UniProtKB/Swiss-Prot annotation:
SUPFAM superfamilies: ABC transporter involved in vitamin B12 uptake, BtuC
Biological processes annotated in GO: monoatomic ion transport; response to zinc ion; transmembrane transport
Biological source species: Bacillus subtilis (strain 168)
Membrane topology: Multi-pass membrane protein
Localization of this protein: Cell membrane
Protein name, per record: Manganese transport system membrane protein MntD
GO cellular component entries: ATP-binding cassette (ABC) transporter complex; plasma membrane
Domain of life, source organism: Bacteria
Amino acid sequence: MSFEAWIIATGVLVGVSCGLIGTFLVLRSMAMLADAISHTVLLGIVGAFLVTGSLDGIYMFIGAAATGLLTAFLVQLLHSKGVQSDAAIGVVFTSLFAIGVILLSVYGANVHLDIEHSLMGEIAFVPWNTVTVFGVDIGPKAFWMLASVLVLNVVLISVCYKEFKIASFDPQMALALGIPVLLIHYVQMGMLSLTTVASFDSVGAVLVVAMLIVPPAAAHLLTDRLLYMLILSALIGGLSAVMGYFFATWLNVSISGAMAAMTGVCYASAFLFSPANGVITKKLRTLNMQKERAG
């Protein structure tokens, strides 16, 4: 595959992976927790490096997953003690992220690990960091990492679809049915953490938030059924990555930024033209009804 194809494929994997797990966050009104975890995993990455002295992917995954779960646990703990959800997210988010930034500034100055790279990413460099198996170059490391995370997300969603669905729409009913709502919550937070850290090398922590929130939000405007919402969210995320790449090459701007911008374009289109909820669609429907009454 060409460098261009690897970049597009990696971006599509980011969009699809984030779109799937982001759907449940949007349904549970936890979109800002995605923003928090996407930043606090920096502490897990730095911590993994300080403990192991290695930038190997598996250690990053473990550190990020642990920090993501810690973030979710602390937010849940503060909320259970009477702190408002948004305030709890703000306290945990800023505290853990600040600790990560300080540790990175103090101990990570001499390694290929910096704040700007962690936050912004650079998908154009993805094809240069490849994986070799039995002497054969099989492609970019980021691509295969994201592919593995996507497979894991799809498997977990498929196996736990009923539990995820009930817990997202009616947690009290889920508890009454014996579904471990808290366990489901932490499974989803683990999925979010892994998806976020896998996306660091491509779109970065800041821009991955757009992929986690905007495609599911757009899909929610287009359908009320969870299965269709998952499919549409994944499609919008993947389509945004493709459009963003060509838009970026056309204007010679940041590829990651263009991909995130395209999610906004997709959301605006759904907001205006959604068959059931679109602003313009509703206006046209109202005008047609007025004409029918007048006629």
